[in-house]
């Protein structure tokens, strides 16, 4: 927005600091440091630098290192000791968390049990399992029906679409800085796009849907995040046409709802009507 260019730089610098200090961008400082959020930082860096009148390459190199480090937080299954985002589909990631057992039990007792009408007297191990999935949702839309309460069992459309764009941005940044020609990153992005299409595209629905790798099926809940492959430009023309054709399922008087409408009561933060 006009007049907010300096604030944009401040926001990017804040995220650089977070990544340098913690190895990732937390959901919030302090209480939210046991999970991250859907990655947009890489695109923020490129957007800011492209519009900056003074091209500070020293700053860009520092920003590039932070973008690469955050990318590895999401994708490095061997070296990431903070959080496990691996899935059975090599090359596609999931949301997660790195909270401790005591915090998860407390989260179940104080938040989830009342909100979702869950049983009080269940083993601590079950509380930890349920709370872990729900806490992982904080890395995306917070509580939402897309994952059936099993967030870490799904390969999400939004996360992997954004990681595709990170690979494109990292290639661009390396070309700007003279590190490489960026082709290796282009190949990574192309590979990810092919995997997203293979596992997350539903020809039956004409939409991109989160993929349940445990039960080997798509989520039964359609979400407006289906547009993200269009936004980043890797959806085919045929896919784009079908998605646009199906977008009315998200229409509401106030704009687009996050998830398709359901006959079930809305207990999530982002169900239909949100």
Please place each PLM-identified region on the residue numbering.
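Sec-exported extracytoplasmic/periplasmic mature domains
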Residues: 20, 50, 72, 76-79, ...
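Long, repeat-rich segments with strong aromatic
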Residues: 152-179, 185, 191-194, 273-274
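Extended glycan-interaction surfaces of carbohydrate-active proteins
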Residues: 8-28, 84-157, 191-274
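Extended, well-ordered alpha-helical scaffold segments
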Residues: 4-15, 55-75, 166, 177-196, ...
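Well-ordered alpha-helical scaffold segments within catalytic/enzyme domains
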Residues: 1-5, 40-55, 161-180, 228-238
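Extracytoplasmic mature domains of secreted/periplasmic and thylakoid-lumen proteins
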Residues: 34, 67-87
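Aromatic/His-enriched, Gly/Pro-containing loop or helix-boundary segments
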Residues: 18-63
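Aromatic- and histidine-enriched alpha-helix N-cap/loop-to-helix transition segments
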Residues: 32-43, 62-66, 154-166, 220-224, ...
């Amino acid at each position: 927005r006009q007049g907010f260019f300096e604030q944009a730089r401040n926001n990017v610098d804040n995220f650089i600091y977070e990544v340098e200090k913690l190895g990732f961008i937390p959901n919030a400082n302090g209480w939210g440091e046991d999970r991250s959020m859907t990655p947009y930082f890489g695109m923020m860096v490129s957007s800011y630098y492209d519009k900056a009148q003074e091209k500070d390459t020293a700053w860009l190199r520092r920003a590039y290192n932070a973008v690469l480090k955050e990318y590895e937080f999401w994708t490095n299954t061997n070296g990431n000791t903070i959080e496990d985002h691996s899935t059975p589909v090599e090359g596609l990631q999931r949301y997660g968390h790195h909270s401790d057992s005591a915090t998860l039990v407390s989260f179940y007792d104080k938040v989830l049990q009342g909100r979702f009408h869950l049983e009080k007297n269940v083993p601590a191990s079950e509380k930890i399992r349920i709370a872990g999935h729900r806490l992982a949702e904080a890395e995306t839309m917070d509580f939402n029906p897309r994952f059936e309460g099993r967030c870490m069992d799904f390969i999400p459309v939004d996360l992997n679409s954004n990681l595709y764009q990170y690979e494109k941005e990292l290639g661009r940044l390396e070309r700007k800085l003279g590190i490489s020609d960026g082709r290796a990153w282009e190949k990574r992005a192309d590979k990810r796009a092919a995997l997203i299409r293979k596992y997350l595209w539903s020809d039956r629905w004409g939409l991109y849907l989160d993929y349940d790798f445990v039960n080997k099926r798509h989520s039964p809940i359609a979400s407006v995040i289906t547009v993200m492959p269009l936004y980043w430009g890797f959806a085919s023309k045929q896919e784009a046409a079908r998605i646009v054709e199906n977008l009315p399922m998200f229409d509401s008087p106030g704009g687009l709802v996050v998830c398709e409408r359901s006959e079930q009561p809305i207990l999530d933060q982002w169900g239909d009507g949100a």
